[in-house]
C-alpha cells in the first residue's frame, strides 16, 4: 500500500479529494499517532502520521478511496491523575469521521484501565471509521429562511414519527427517507408547521447499563461520532448521508426547515468506568473538563463534560456545526444542555464558542436554539444567552401548566409569559422570537399525559421509578390514567384545548411535540429515553383526528395575527394587545394579582381570546363590536356572533371582529 505523505492540517477528519485521502487529528498531548487501515477481512496496516502543524497531526494517503475503513492508535503518557489516558492498545474513532461501522458493546476490552493501562487490544471488536465522499447534487436547493415571527417548530424522533405510519412504505418507515415522503410532507403542510426539529440523528451509543437491562438509548443523547449519521435510521448504512440529504431537499421544497438537536456537551465515553473509543484516548486532558484528581467534571449528568473553551476542541465543535450546515443544508440547531457551551468553567455570555459562532458567516445565519441549563453550579442560564440564540422557555411551560391545570398562578404572571416573557428575553436587542414557548417536549409528559396523570410512571425504565422529574404541574382531573367517564374525557379535552391554544397563540416561537396533536400517550412515562417500542412510536391509526384538525386550525390562525408574526415587543397602546376583564373592561391592578379568574386578550384589535380558568361556568361580556367565534371554536360556514360568552370551566374561545 502507498506510504503516507505529509498532507495538510485542514480540513478536519478524512477528506477525499478525488485522488486520495487527507487525514487529520487534533491532539495537543500525543507523542505519536498511528493511522490504522483495515481491509475487507479485517487485516490492519499501520502508518505513522508524518505531519504535525501545531496540535494537528496529519498525513495523505494517495490512491485511498471512499469506503476505506480506518481508526487511530494514539501514543502518549498514562498519567490518570494529570488527566492523560493514552493507550495505543485501543483503536479509536476519528472524532470527525463521516461514517462509523460497528457499535459499542458492553465489553471489558473497551476499558482503558485504572492505575495502569489495559493492554488488551480491541481492534477486532472496535467500531471502524469509513471514508465517504461529500459530493451530492443539491439541484437548486435553498434554505427556507423562515422569519422567527412565522416559525412553528415540530419536535420529532426520526423512528418514532413514522415507524407505525400505515401510508408510508414499510421498507422506509422509521427511516430518514420517510421524512421526505409525500405523505409526511403533505401532513406537515396541512398541520402548518414550518420547522422540523429532529431529536439526535448523529451516531450515538447505548450505555452499558442499558445494554445489561436489555434496553437501548432511544432518544440518542449519547454521541459517539459528531460528524456521522446514526446508521439505524438509514435503509442502507452506506447511503445514510444521501438518504438524509434527500429528505432535507424534499422538506426544503415544501418550505420546511430542518433543525438538528445536537449534543456537544459530553460523549458516550461517560465516566471513568465508561468505554474508551475516541476522545479519552486521543487527548483526554484537552477534550474534557478535568478535576485536580484527574476525574471528570460531570456538569451534564452523563459522566463527563466537553471543554469547549479549549481552542482545539472549540474548533472541532465549530467545524462540526459548519459541516451539518454546508454539507447537509440543515437550517439550525437545538443545543442540548447548552450552558456547557458557555463554561470557562463559569458560564459567560462572551465565552469563546459563543463569540466564534456569532462571528461565523455560516453559523450566524442559521437558527440557534439553546436548552439554557446544565446540572452544574451556575448552570441555569435562561435568558442569558447571546443575542443570536433563542432559548427553551421553561417559565412559559410551567406557567401555562400551572394556570390551566393547577390554577395557582396570577393573571399577571400568566400574561407575562403569554406576551413573550419580556422580563427574561428583552435585553441585548433580542426579540420575542428568542422565547421558544413549549408546553411539552420529548423530556417529560406528553400533552395527553399532562391531563391524565398526576404522578410519573417510569417503572419500565429499570430505575424503580426514581428517574424523571417529580415536578410536572400536571392534573389527572380526578382519576390516574387513561380512559374514564364521558365527563372526565370532556374535561381533559377542554384542558388540552386550553394548553394548545395558549401555546400557539402566544407571543414567541411555539414548539409542538410530535404526537401531541394526535393525543399520543406514553402511559405516564415522563422519561422514555430507553423505550424503543410502542410506548414512544406514534400510533397513526388511532390518532385523534379531531385534535389534529384543532391544532392545524390554531397554527393557521396564528399566521393571520400581525401581533404574533411581527416579532416585536408589545408596547402599551400600540394596538398589538389589550388585556380585559370578564366584563370587557381594562384589567385593574387588583385583578392582575388574582390567582383564579377570567380574562380576555385582544390581539391586533381584531382577534379576541376569552379565558376562563375557574372551575365554574362564567359569563364573559365581550368588548364593544360584533364578535364571531371562529374555527376551531366554531364552524367556518356558520360562525357564532356573541355579545356574551358562557365560558365553560377551564375553557377558552377565540373570536374575530367582523
Curated annotation (Swiss-Prot):
What is the source species?
Answer: Escherichia fergusonii (strain ATCC 35469 / DSM 13698 / CCUG 18766 / IAM 14443 / JCM 21226 / LMG 7866 / NBRC 102419 / NCTC 12128 / CDC 0568-73)
Q: Which EC class heads this enzyme's classification?
A: hydrolase
Region annotation Disordered: where it falls in the sequence? 460-484
**What protein does this entry describe?**
Glycogen debranching enzyme
What pathway does the UniProt record associate with this protein?
A: Glycan degradation; glycogen degradation
Q: Which Pfam families match?
A: Alpha-amylase, CBM_48, GlgX_C
User: What InterPro entries does the record point to?
Assistant: GlgX_C, GlgX_Isoamylase_N_E_set, Glyco_hydro_13_cat_dom, Glyco_hydro_13_N, Glyco_hydro_b, Glycogen_debranch_bac, Glycogen_debranch_GlgX, Glycoside_hydrolase_SF
Q: Where is the active site?
A: 336, 371
Q: What gene codes for this chain?
A: glgX
Amino acid at each position: 500500500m502507498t506510504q503516507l505523505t505529509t498532507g495538510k492540517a485542514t480540513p478536519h477528519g478524512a477528506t477525499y479529494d478525488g485522488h486520495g485521502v487527507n487525514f487529520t487529528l487534533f491532539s495537543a498531548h500525543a507523542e505519536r499517532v498511528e493511522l490504522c487501515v483495515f481491509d475487507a477481512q479485517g487485516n490492519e496496516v499501520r502508518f505513522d502520521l508524518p505531519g504535525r502543524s501545531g496540535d494537528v497531526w496529519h498525513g495523505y494517503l494517495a490512491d485511498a478511496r471512499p469506503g476505506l475503513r480506518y481508526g487511530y492508535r494514539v501514543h502518549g503518557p498514562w498519567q490518570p491523575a494529570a488527566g492523560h489516558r493514552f493507550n495505543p492498545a485501543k483503536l479509536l474513532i476519528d472524532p470527525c469521521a463521516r461514517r462509523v461501522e460497528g457499535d459499542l458493546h458492553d465489553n471489558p476490552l473497551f476499558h482503558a484501565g485504572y492505575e495502569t493501562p489495559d493492554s488488551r487490544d480491541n481492534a477486532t471488536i472496535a467500531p471502524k471509521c469509513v471514508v465517504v465522499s461529500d459530493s451530492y447534487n443539491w439541484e437548486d436547493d435553498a434554505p427556507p429562511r423562515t422569519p422567527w415571527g412565522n416559525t412553528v417548530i415540530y419536535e420529532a424522533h426520526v423512528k418514532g414519527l413514522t415507524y407505525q405510519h400505515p401510508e408510508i412504505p414499510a421498507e422506509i418507515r422509521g427511516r430518514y427517507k420517510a421524512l421526505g415522503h409525500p405523505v409526511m410532507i403533505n401532513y406537515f403542510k396541512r398541520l402548518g408547521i414550518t420547522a422540523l426539529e429532529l431529536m439526535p440523528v448523529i451516531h450515538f451509543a447505548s450505555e452499558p447499563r442499558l445494554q445489561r437491562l436489555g434496553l437501548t438509548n432511544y432518544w440518542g443523547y449519547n454521541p459517539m461520532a459528531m460528524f456521522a449519521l446514526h446508521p439505524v435510521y438509514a435503509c442502507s448504512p452506506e447511503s445514510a448521508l444521501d438518504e438524509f440529504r434527500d429528505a432535507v431537499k424534499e422538506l426544503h421544497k415544501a418550505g420546511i426547515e430542518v433543525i438538528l438537536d445536537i449534543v456537544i456537551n459530553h460523549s458516550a465515553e461517560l465516566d471513568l468506568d465508561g468505554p474508551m473509543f475516541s476522545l479519552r484516548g486521543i487527548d483526554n486532558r484537552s477534550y474534557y473538563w478535568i478535576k485536580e484528581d484527574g476525574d471528570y467534571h460531570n456538569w451534564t449528568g452523563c459522566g463527563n463534560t466537553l471543554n469547549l473553551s479549549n481552542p482545539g476542541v472549540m474548533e472541532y465543535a465549530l467545524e462540526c456545526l459548519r459541516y451539518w450546515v454546508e454539507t447537509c443544508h440543515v437550517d439550525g440547531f437545538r443545543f442540548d444542555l447548552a450552558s456547557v457551551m458557555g463554561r470557562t468553567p463559569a458560564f459567560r455570555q462572551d465565552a469563546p464558542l459563543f463569540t466564534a459562532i456569532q462571528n461565523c458567516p455560516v453559523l450566524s445565519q442559521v437558527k440557534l436554539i439553546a436548552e439554557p441549563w446544565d446540572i452544574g453550579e451556575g448552570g441555569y442560564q435562561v435568558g442569558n444567552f447571546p443575542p443570536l440564540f433563542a432559548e427553551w422557555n421553561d417559565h412559559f411551560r410551567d406557567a401555562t401548566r400551572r394556570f390551566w391545570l393547577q390554577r395557582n398562578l396570577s393573571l399577571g404572571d400568566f400574561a407575562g409569559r403569554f406576551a413573550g416573557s419580556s422580563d427574561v428575553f428583552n435585553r441585548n436587542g433580542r426579540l420575542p422570537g428568542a422565547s421558544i414557548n413549549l408546553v411539552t417536549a420529548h423530556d417529560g409528559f406528553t400533552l395527553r399525559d399532562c391531563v391524565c396523570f398526576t404522578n410519573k410512571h417510569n417503572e419500565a425504565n429499570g430505575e424503580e421509578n426514581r428517574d424523571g422529574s417529580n415536578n410536572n404541574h400536571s392534573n389527572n382531573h380526578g382519576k390516574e390514567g387513561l380512559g374514564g367517564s364521558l365527563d372526565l374525557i370532556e374535561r381533559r379535552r377542554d384542558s388540552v384545548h386550553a394548553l394548545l391554544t395558549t401555546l400557539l397563540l402566544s407571543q414567541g416561537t411555539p414548539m409542538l411535540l410530535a404526537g401531541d396533536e394526535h393525543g399520543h400517550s406514553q402511559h405516564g412515562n415522563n422519561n422514555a429515553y430507553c423505550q424503543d417500542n410502542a410506548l414512544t412510536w406514534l400510533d397513526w391509526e388511532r390518532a385523534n383526528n379531531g385534535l389534529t384538525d384543532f391544532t392545524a386550525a390554531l397554527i393557521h390562525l396564528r399566521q393571520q395575527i400581525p401581533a404574533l408574526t411581527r416579532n416585536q415587543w408589545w408596547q402599551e397602546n400600540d394596538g398589538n394587545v389589550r388585556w380585559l376583564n370578564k366584563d370587557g373592561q381594562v384589567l385593574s391592578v387588583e385583578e392582575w394579582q388574582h390567582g383564579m379568574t377570567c380574562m380576555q386578550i385582544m390581539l391586533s384589535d381584531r382577534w379576541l381570546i376569552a379565558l376562563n380558568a375557574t372551575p365554574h361556568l362564567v359569563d364573559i361580556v365581550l368588548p364593544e363590536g360584533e364578535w364571531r367565534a371562529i374555527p376551531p371554536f366554531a364552524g367556518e360556514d356558520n360562525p357564532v356572533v356573541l355579545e356574551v360568552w358562557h365560558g365553560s370551566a377551564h375553557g377558552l374561545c377565540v373570536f374575530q371582529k367582523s
